Amino acid sequence: MKKLLIANRGEIALRVVRTAQEMGIETVAVYAEQDRNAPYTQMADEAYLLPGDTNLQTYLNEDLIVDVARRAGADALHPGYGFLSEFPTFARKVIDAGITWVGPSPHVLEELGDKITACKVAERAKVPVVPGIAEPVSDMRVLLDFANHNGYPVMMKKADGGGGRGITPINNDDELRAFYMNHDALQGGDLGDYFIEKFVDKARHVETQSGRDSHGNFTVYSTRDCSVQRRNQKLVEEAPAPFLSDDVIAQLEGFSHRLFATAGYVGLGTCEFLVSKGKVYFMEVNPRLQVEHTVSEQVCGLDLVREQLDIADGG
């Protein structure tokens, strides 16, 4: 890896530029007009303008960014987080252009791209999931049967939700019927985007910062507790996650390993779990670097961007 394009902006672009330059890798930044004088464009070895007025025309423009990477002579591309970092179409275009994609493969991004398909990966890996129906249900009777068999409360969750979006708690039959009527696909609603899960009471939200290389070597860099939230948005991240028994830690690490191995995951990512009464339940995998990766760096003593670049380069 000799020349790296960072397909992002702001803090994460600056973060990747810094590490790449420490590794002796030339860096290429891309920017929309409003970011022309941003610190990351000044620090990078080269910077290219993305013409356009919106994110869709600039930072979300897959073909334009791949074309810039070609013109700049970049042999690798780091997507950062957000924007195109989880788009399998973009990853495939980068790879098809002969450029190293710093992240998991397009196939892995597809499998982990929404909560329903990710739960199916977990089931193949024999990792416990929260009791639920891991597919959209259009029959009201099926939803009511599930809720009454497992007990309220339950949750209706959007398959492509993230960051606390698309979660609706349901406490009784009337609320479930109201949700169904408001989202019924036959009336132009989005019921087909939702699945049902049992609500896990008094659960902690614990995640593992994990990595796996192309040789199958796996590690958990640290656990993180992100249970302190407001409106399902994380407020505080603590690493390592406190007050976990040895058995729970072993479950978290073992389940993360099985998830990565089953998916054929190569790169860094975050496995998210619910922990309740000594039991661990899979939630999702974030197949990219997360904003909070620096919390894990503080306790593991490693540069996780360097780890990403080493793994992508075959290390």
Please place each PLM-identified region on the residue numbering.
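N-terminal beta-alpha lobe that positions the nucleotide/phosphoryl donor
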Residues: 1-271, 275-296
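Catalytic cores of soluble metabolic enzymes centered on carboxylation/carboxyl-transfer
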Residues: 296, 302-315
